[in-house]
Amino acid sequence: MAKKPIKITEVVLRDAHQSLLATRMTMDEMRPILPEMDKIPYFSVECWGGATFDSCIRFLDEDPWERLRILRKELPHQKLQMLFRGQNMLGYRPYADDAVEYFVKKSVANGIDVIRIFDALNDARNLQTAIKSANKEGAHVQGCISYTLSPVHNNEYYVKYAKTLEEMGANSICIKDMAGLLTPYTCYELVKELKNTLSIPVDIHSHYTAGLASMSLLKGIEAGADIVDTAMSPLSGGTSHMATESPVSYTHLSAMRAASSLVR
């Protein structure tokens, strides 16, 4: 039986410029590429949430909700994805449950399809309201493992936490390696253990800060990861992500799970 092709989440419209350009990309700077991006069969396009909401208001004199509506109109064939900080929403402190519920409701109503939800401390209690609300609104809920290194943060810990998120209602799990600390063989082992334990897809999100991401994602693909996060090459590398062209090219030229349908 043929292996399922690897899927791509494109982060150039959110995490890539948040990492390299302090989230200063304007809507006018995004618009020229959107028609071409809409032709590519991504799993999702991450384009909202994280620091974009704050940056639109604080620095760019833009309405973040209007940005989302424009992206929804310009990318009609894509699943739009946002990053959501659980009980902190898109802010920097915890908010009341009813605020979280209403924000999730309006995010989906204005065009969001996939909500990636994380808590920096991996405290599942801070994700309960967001996961429940996102499921209620019909969004794809992606629960996150916030990856780090410490005496207690090992693969057993992460697999147990991921299983908790699945039981809470997550539709997929993201290994969210914000600092670029995930090494290739650790990634392989972690993905293998997650795939053996979970019944939902596994996504790998790893920043290029330490120069490890391309090798780590490759080993993750070999281990059975379903989705990888990448950024188109002009905004890849550094503190951003592996270039989208890399896994597409490699899987196309090898016997791996080809992502070559993304080639244009």
Model-derived features with residue positions:
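Conserved small/polar residues in nucleotide/adenosyl-binding loops
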Residues: 250-256
